[in-house]
Amino acid sequence: MDSITIYTTSSCPYCHAAKDLLKKKGVTFTEIDVTGKPDQRRAMSARAQGRTSVPQIFIRERHVGGCDDLYDLDRAGQLDPLLAA
């Protein structure tokens, strides 16, 4: 399994934006589409401290949060070191 996991739904524009940033960074990730999959959505929520919105992004076991959080890390210069660790 890749060290980056992103929980998504097929129609979520924020999910697409987060995946685009990760692709731009040249990293591979595991995408778990929770569309119509309540068991996977519950597992995502449990792993994301109760958050139910998508995307939910994990780098290794660190919960990064959603799309805005990912872009905030990038703007702050903290995403590349996190991806390289």
Where on the chain are the PLM-derived regions?
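Residues that form or flank phosphate/diphosphate-binding pockets in enzymes
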Residues: 16, 39, 65
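Non-catalytic, surface beta->alpha helical segment in thiol-disulfide oxidoreductase systems
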Residues: 59-85
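Thioredoxin-like thiol-disulfide oxidoreductase module
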Residues: 34-52, 78-85
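Structural micro-motif
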Residues: 49-58, 68
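Local sequence-structure signature of Cys/Sec-based thiol-disulfide redox active-site neighborhoods
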Residues: 1-28
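Short, glycine/charged-enriched secondary-structure capping and boundary segments
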Residues: 20-22, 45, 71-73
